[in-house]
Amino acid sequence: MARIAGVNIPNHQHIWVGLQAIYGIGATRAKVICSAAGIEISTKVKDLTDAEMEKLRDEIAKFTIEGDLRREVTMNIKRLMDLGCYRGFRHRRGLPCRGQRTRTNARTRKGPRKPIAGKK
């Protein structure tokens, strides 16, 4: 297994698919990285040379990925909550903040239903 940015990339996959195991790299960015490094996207991870791996590492180092990206996203949400804006308020309450309805649905964000004590 190749190790890039602290993540193990599976050997049997094409390089552009394997790069998507890194947090912050999706399909489009993986293809851009491969083309910038001069590597064919259909190349398997196990067939890469050490020089190609170094080129990939150099290209990936240009982007914010993994822990730094997670920290940045967390800090952005925390900033919204500290501002007291609508989106921060919705994050604080654990509700959807992009305009979805909440009278029904939104169960993923709200969590499981809480039973209300009934009359006997």
From Swiss-Prot:
Question: Could you give one GO CC term from the UniProt record?
Answer: cytosol
Q: Name one GO molecular function term.
A: rRNA binding
Record keyword tRNA-binding present = yes
GO BP terms: namely: translation
Q: Which UniProt keywords apply?
A: Ribonucleoprotein, Ribosomal protein, RNA-binding, rRNA-binding, tRNA-binding
A Pfam family matched in the record: Ribosomal_S13
Q: Where is this region: Disordered?
A: 92-120
PROSITE patterns with a match to the protein in the record = RIBOSOMAL_S13_1, RIBOSOMAL_S13_2
InterPro entries, A to Z: Rbsml_uS13_C, Ribosomal_uS13, Ribosomal_uS13-like_H2TH, Ribosomal_uS13_bac-type, Ribosomal_uS13_CS
Keyword check for Ribonucleoprotein, yes or no.
yes
The UniProt family comment states: Belongs to the universal ribosomal protein uS13 family.
Q: What does this protein do?
A: Located at the top of the head of the 30S subunit, it contacts several helices of the 16S rRNA. In the 70S ribosome it contacts the 23S rRNA (bridge B1a) and protein L5 of the 50S subunit (bridge B1b), connecting the 2 subunits; these bridges are implicated in subunit movement. Contacts the tRNAs in the A and P-sites.
What is the protein named? Small ribosomal subunit protein uS13
Q: Which organism is it from?
A: Laribacter hongkongensis (strain HLHK9)
Q: What is the lineage of its organism?
A: Bacteria, Pseudomonadati, Pseudomonadota, Betaproteobacteria, Neisseriales
